[in-house]
Each structure stands twice: as C-alpha cells, then as structure tokens.
Amino acid sequence: MSHSSLSWLSNFNVETVPSKYLRRSSIIGTIGPKTNNVDVLVKLRKAGLNVVRMNFSHGSYEYHQSVIDNARKSEEVYKGRPLAIALDTKGPEIRTGTTIGDKDYPIPPNHEMIFTTDDAYKTKCDDKVMYIDYKNITKVIAPGKIIYVDDGVLSFEVISVDDEQTLKVRSLNAGKISSHKGVNLPGTDVDLPALSEKDIADIKFGVKNKVHMIFASFIRTANDVLEIRKVLGEEGKDIQIISKIENQQGVNNFDEILEVTDGVMVARGDLGIEIPAPQVFVVQKQLIAKCNLAAKPVICATQMLESMTYNPRPTRAEVSDVGNAILDGADCVMLSGETAKGNYPVEAVSMMHNTCLTAEKAIAYPQLFNELRSLAKKPTATTETCAVAAVSAAYEQDAKAIVVLSTSGLSARLVSKYKPDVPILMVTRNERAAKFSHLYRGVYPFIYDKPSIENWQEDVENRLRWAVSEAVELGIISKGDSIVTVQGWTRGSGHSNTVRIVQA
C-alpha cells in the first residue's frame, strides 16, 4: 500500500479500467425536448444516467408531467439501476423589465442611465431607464457597487442612490440591454424570499408526483431550507432537499446551511458571476470537502461538458473539469444543456461515465479513509462506528464488496462517507431510499421486494443471500469472495450495529 497520495498517483496504471457497472459517482441529466421520450431515456440510462432533472425555470406542468411519466415508463422498458427524479426550482431571482417594443437597446461604455423599481416603467424600458423587479435594491446597494445584467454580459457601476426607487448607474462595457434579463448583485446581501409563489406551486407539484429530490435554487441561509421543508410538509418528508449554492451569501452561510440540508449542489453558473471567476474552483473544493466531512452528498454542476451541446467531442479542459470534480470528492456530476437541448445527449452521458470511471481509480482510497477516520468527531454514533469498522474490515480482508441491509439509507450513506475502494451494495425494501441513494458515492441500490417475515434473523439471512446472488449474477463479485456486511439487530431505521465477514 502506498503511504501517500503522491506515491499512489506516481504508480497509477491508467490502463486498468474497472467493469462498467462499478462507476461510483452518479450522473444527473437535465431532460429537454431532445431527450423527453422513452427510447432516448433508455439509451441515456444504458449510457450511465442515474438521475433525471427537470428544470422548472422553463416548461409547463404538462411538459414536466410528461418527463416524469416517460422516466417511469423507461424503468418498465429497461430495468437496469433504479432511476431517481429531481425537481430544480426556478428560485427567487432579479430581472429587468420589458423594453419598449421588446427591442434590444445598444449600450456603449460609460453610458449613464437610471435603474428604477417604479412600476410605471415595468413595460417601458429603454437605454435611458430600466425597470428592476427587486423592490429593495435601493436599500441594499451602495455607490461603487457593481450590477451585472444578462449573466454578466453587461456590467454597471452604481453612481448614486437617488431615492427609494431610483439608482443612477454607469456602464463599464458595451453590450445590449433587453427584456427580462437576469440581474446579479455581487458582494451585496439581498433579502429576497426563499420561495416565490411559483416555487411553492412547483414544489407541491413535485410532492404530488413523488419526486425524490428538490434542487433548491439560490439558497442563502439555513432558514431558506427550513422554509422549503415546511412547504414539503408531511407528505413530502422523504424528499431530499439539495441546496444550490449560487452566491456569496450562500458561501458565507454555508456551515449553517449544511447543518439543515440533505445535500448540496455547487452551482457554478451564477456562482461564477457573484464571486470572482478565479475563486470558483477553490470554493468548489472547499464546499465539497465540507460536505465529505459532514457525510452530506454533493453535486458539481454547470458547463461540465458544455461544448458537447453542439460537438460530438468535449474540450480537454471540460474532461479535466469533470475528472477534477470527482477527485475533489463530488458524489454526483450534472449535465444541463448537453442533455436538455444538445445534439449528442447519449454521447455526453457516455463521455461523463468514462471520465468518472478513470478519475475514480486515480483516488488514493486507503489514504483518504485514514484521513476521514482521523477527522471524525469522537465519540461517533453507533451506526457511524459500524460504518468505519466495515470499511476497515474490507481493507483488512481484501473484501470485494460491502453489503448494507438498510431501511432508510442512513447506514449506506455513512459507509459511503469513508470512501471504500469496493462497491457498497445497499439492500432495501424502501424504493424511495434506493432511488435517492444515487446521491451517495459508491452506493449501488438493490430493491428487495419480498415481504418481511416474523423471524428477524431469518429475514436478514434471506436478504443477504439474495443480494450476494444478484451481485454474483451481475459480475460485481465472484463465488468465494470475502464480503463485509452491515446490519441491524432489530427492525427499523438507525439500528445498524453488526458487522460480519462472510464468503460469497
């Protein structure tokens, strides 16, 4: 065993590729017009797609219903691994008003104009006056601050705050200003509500359709997450909330957000506008590291294989970006336009799959395990102690898999935290837990559909035998291999306290 990550990498053999089934990280794909049919969804799943994402910034309820229906039909057509469904909220945002005649108005450098919250200009914007739909902008902004319009295509400096409704600004570059463009206020704390009326309606639509996770846009504080939890209510209590970190406030308040959220998405699009671009990759590494230590799943997203929207092959920089996200510790990576509107959606998923496979085998797993174990706060809870023991036993025994008999997915998540170099086979009767387990690195869900029997120990042995049989049939393990098992002493969630070593 190499004693450092450096020696591990120096001895790394890039030609050694694990079997196709054993990709540890998960791939999320946004479904759009190019991919919203059962045949294409089956192809995407065969290429490696694990989670379907619906972007609620676009599309009607009828359209999103068709995505859900087609995703579920694809599971009937092709069994494969369980498919999870995620709803991505539009989130609270700031936008410009409507220009006169819906025209684009050219803006030269050093051009002075007015930004106003006066509703009289809502549909009467031009190159002299532009309506901004954030009523409190004059209260939070100050002279010298920067305002970005249209994802930073246009930049303005605030000259003065003239009254409760009016800002005077100066353009810092040339461009065009037009209707309904996004507005960013980098370095300014805003007090937008966590949820718009549309977001609330969208989340209720997701609850009704039993989606597995909510990707919550523009999360700034822990209270934002709690507000979403209230909207989910009792009916949606099992839906995972993934907080999208997209602004400086979210970064500043990350520790409190991490305590209450189920997971995190590093959403680098808006984040790269809100904070200086050279800082984004460092913030990405920091947030992923914090999630890894807290055993919270983390997704890396935005422009990962962007050029594959129109080209059959990505740039080398994009491939490196995906690989480095995996090396940073991301549990999942996400595709947006590449699968929603791109010309090569299946190829994009396949490229991401192969890139993740290669990156995963470059990780120095023993060193990572020792580091994570040394940083865990003591004393650990019983379930986490069992997770550490299982991973340690897998190394000592040269085991080929860790089988976790789970009710809620907690035990599998904690084993995943310690990043074993063998697959974690999660056996559960809980279909929802199986599907959102795609959020956890290295977890492969197996849905055990036989009814529970009264004799607990016999029920445990039945599930274990079935899981081993399935894993052998899939080629994950072979007859005679050592495997480590994690199980509970009684029924219910949170009772895992037994680690065993058995032969397949």
Swiss-Prot record:
Supply the InterPro entries for this chain. Pyr_Knase, Pyrv/PenolPyrv_kinase-like_dom, Pyrv_kinase-like_dom_sf, Pyrv_Knase-like_insert_dom_sf, Pyrv_Knase_AS, Pyrv_Knase_brl, Pyrv_Knase_C, Pyrv_Knase_C_sf
Localized where? Cytoplasm
State the EC number(s): 2.7.1.40
Q: What class of enzyme is it?
A: transferase
For the ligand (Mg(2+)), the binding residues are 246, 270
UniProt cofactor(s): Mg(2+); K(+)
Q: Where does K(+) bind?
A: 55, 57, 88-89
Is Transport among the key words of this record?
no
Keyword Kinase found: yes
The organism's superkingdom is given as: Eukaryota
Q: Which GO terms describe its biological process?
A: cellular response to starvation; filamentous growth; filamentous growth of a population of unicellular organisms in response to biotic stimulus; filamentous growth of a population of unicellular organisms in response to starvation; glycolytic process; symbiont-mediated perturbation of host immune response
- Site-annotated residues for Transition state stabilizer: 244
- Identify the metabolic or biological route this protein is part of: Carbohydrate degradation; glycolysis; pyruvate from D-glyceraldehyde 3-phosphate: step 5/5
Q: Where is the signal peptide?
A: none
An example of a Gene Ontology cellular component annotation for this protein is: yeast-form cell wall
Hey, which family's this protein in? Belongs to the pyruvate kinase family.
> What is this protein identified as?
Pyruvate kinase
Which species does the entry assign this protein to? Answer: Candida albicans (strain SC5314 / ATCC MYA-2876)
In the UniProt record, the gene name given for this protein reads CDC19
